[in-house]
């Protein structure tokens, strides 16, 4: 009997792996239908017919909607309850991150990560193990990720929205939990800072700091032009503007060790000998950890391998990388986010 139970459990686990993509794409469907916002804005739970009548595309196949909602309830994203003989749907706690208009909304990340083109490199995972040059992204889409973004403005916008989404999540935790890292800083450059969302959080929390976002021209072109943030276009491999501190959020994981050392050396040149530092916001892997984010961090490591040729790093790998770039020391602080904060001291 135990053997049968083990077989059933193992087969069920494998089937769930096989159809693992379904949860991502049903989640995408929920976002596209705006289900969380419709229920949130109603102020109460809703029947299927009420929900159906408010969907953006009409007419609606209510049987199909019922089946999608049944799956979303099973995912524990939505709730269902019988009230006065009617089945009504509400929001489970994770669904609040699908509600637009607050700083922790994750819709931008969902739409980018589940985009057909951005998922394509995963189909080339095996090819990435061949030892041949080129990333899975290049094999799937014919160019590297940076060239692709420059050539496809609509995808670049999707990507930038996801990065801005991620920045709001991370920076909220960073400012609240280790704002002291900005003590004594009057100027800061966010290298690879996208459209400026991350550094804007710093500018608002610490108005005395003059903040600059530094990124590639096609990225800066999409910046909304925040009054608190100065925008500069350029190439971090060639030059980094001078400041008391350099910040890089989710940048070094895009690159291999050799390129990271080059970037870190450019950062070292940009900060003053006295009090200068580099603030790295990136994942610190601990594969033995039972932390809820461990699987996510390992997934992102594969994602970097596929898309950029980069990697997520363990604490020991960060220590070696920073040392090899000629820095004198570093400090790692965990925050309530997927990433940690690494302060690197060049002098």
From Swiss-Prot:
Chain positions recorded as S-adenosyl-L-methionine binding sites: 192, 215, 235-236, 249
The reply on keyword Oxidoreductase is no
Q: What is its EC number?
A: 2.1.1.128
Active-site feature positions? 253 (proton acceptor)
Per the record, the pathway is:
Alkaloid biosynthesis; (S)-reticuline biosynthesis; (S)-reticuline from (S)-norcoclaurine: step 1/4
Q: How far does the signal peptide extend, from start to end residue?
A: none
Which reactions is this enzyme annotated as catalysing?
A: norcoclaurine + S-adenosyl-L-methionine = coclaurine + S-adenosyl-L-homocysteine + H(+)
Keyword Transferase present in the record's keywords: the answer is yes
Which cysteine pairs are joined by S-S bonds?
none
Keywords for this protein: Methyltransferase, S-adenosyl-L-methionine, Transferase
One GO MF term, please?
Answer: protein dimerization activity
What's a GO biological-process term for it?
methylation
Task: Give any Pfam family that matches.
Answer: Dimerisation
Q: Which protein family is it in?
A: Belongs to the class I-like SAM-binding methyltransferase superfamily. Cation-independent O-methyltransferase family. COMT subfamily.
This chain's function reads: Catalyzes the transfer of the S-methyl group of S-adenosyl-L-methionine (AdoMet) to the 6-hydroxyl group of norcoclaurine to form coclaurine.
Task: State how it assembles.
Answer: Homodimer.
Name listed for the protein in its UniProt record: (RS)-norcoclaurine 6-O-methyltransferase
